[in-house]
Regions:
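NAD(P)H-binding glycine-rich loop region in Rossmannoid oxidoreductase-like domains
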Residues: 44, 70-73, 78-126
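Conserved Rossmann-fold NAD(P)-dependent oxidoreductase catalytic core, especially the SDR/UDP-sugar
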Residues: 32, 105-108, 113, 129-173
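Amphipathic terminal alpha-helices
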Residues: 1-23, 312-343
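N-terminal Rossmann NAD(P)H-binding glycine-rich loop of SDR-like oxidoreductase domains
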Residues: 32-52
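Glycine/proline-rich active-site loop of Rossmann-fold NAD(P)-dependent oxidoreductases
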Residues: 179, 191-195, 204-214, 221-222, ...
Length: 343
């Protein structure tokens, strides 16, 4: 799949377009849906995809509620126009979470990564208190809890990557807070026999954010591309959102974990050179490839759900086309090149 996007509206429509498999999964599942932490980079598109998927399945009466702090009220209003109910809520406030609407299906996106170096206490709080409140409120529901591939340690860059059996012994406060998020949620889910899937998402990308965006913008601006983290795995955000919906069926007792990323192991240097070819710029590099990297083995995901619809090169072409025409950026660098886990 390779699309070009004339504007933000066209891009947002694409990112919220459900796959046929996501529609079929929603048709098999029962209950209303709540999306916790829906105000971030991925949340609005995921909430819209759920709404559109239910509508496509003829289940228009089922309710979709997006929950976030919603400091940007325009974001909430836009969701409401698309028939997604919104609730402004501090997801670390157990009393406020207890008042959220009932749901049989929960997508939990709440988390904090950036700013950990300056405020580590808040990172630990967000990544543990919010899932604890959610697991109490929605005990018995099917829950997909977004996690990260950073829960694993760095692995040899020439190996297959960390799989779900790899010990969770990462570097850095953020990654360890992410492990704590999984442990707290797993404990509470097991105690209440709540079906839970730990969705270890590894570098979702779209034109305004992500590793490809970061590399493409640096190449376009003539800025050096850091290749110390020499290899990456990626997945197009629409594919990741569709998989999150499908993973509601994979939520299990005891909790299950799944690495969610693309099939291809990409060289950052080669990625920059590809962006340079598409943008008409010669990339500049800094650093040298380390012998280890954050890489993930997602064969279990692909065996169950099949490969993502969007290839890595299709994603590169879509991002570079967006960057070339001066499309907007979220202005949130991924810091993918970090090797010590300090974000």
């Amino acid at each position: 799949m390779h699309e070009s996007f004339a504007d933000v509206a066209a891009l947002d429509e694409h990112l919220a377009r459900p796959t046929a498999a996501a529609v079929e999964a929603l048709a098999r599942l029962d209950g209303d849906v709540v999306v916790l932490g829906a105000g971030g980079k991925m949340g609005p598109a995921l909430a819209r995809m759920v709404r559109r998927g239910l509508d496509a399945a003829g289940l228009t009466a089922r309710r979709v509620t997006a929950v976030s702090g919603f400091t940007d009220r325009a974001k909430a209003a836009a969701l409401e126009r698309d028939r997604v109910a919104t609730v402004a809520c501090d997801l670390m406030d157990r009393d406020a979470v207890a008042r959220l609407p009932d749901a049989g299906l929960v997508l939990h996106l709440t988390g904090q990564k950036f700013g950990t170096g300056s405020d580590p206490a808040r990172t630990w709080a967000v990544n543990t208190l919010a899932p604890a409140a959610a697991l109490d409120r929605y005990a018995g529901a099917r829950i997909v809890l977004f996690s990260t591939g950073c829960v694993y340690p760095l692995v040899p860059a020439d190996g297959p990557g960390a799989d779900e059996a790899t010990r969770l012994e990462p570097a850095g406060e953020y990654a360890n807070a992410a492990v704590a998020r999984e442990r707290v949620a797993g404990f509470l889910a097991a105690r209440s026999a709540t079906p839970l899937l730990l969705f270890r998402l590894c570098y979702a990308v779209e034109p305004r954010y992500g590793v490809i965006h970061d590399v493409a913008r640096r190449v376009a601006a003539g800025e050096p591309v850091d290749v110390r983290m020499g290899w990456v795995n990626l997945i197009w955000q629409r594919d990741a959102a569709a998989l999150a919906i499908r993973c509601l069926e994979a939520a299990a007792v005891p909790p299950a974990a799944l690495n969610v990323t693309g099939l291809e192991r990409l060289s950052v240097r080669a990625l920059a050179e590809r962006c340079g070819a598409l943008l008409g710029r010669r990339p500049v590099f800094t650093g040298a490839e380390a012998p280890q990297a954050w890489l993930w083995d997602a064969r279990a995901c692909h065996a169950r759900f099949g490969p993502p619809e969007t290839t890595a090169d299709e994603a590169v072409r879509m991002v570079c086309a967006w960057v070339a025409r001066g499309g907007e950026s979220f202005g949130k660098p991924t810091k993918f090149e970090v090797l010590d886990g300090r974000f």
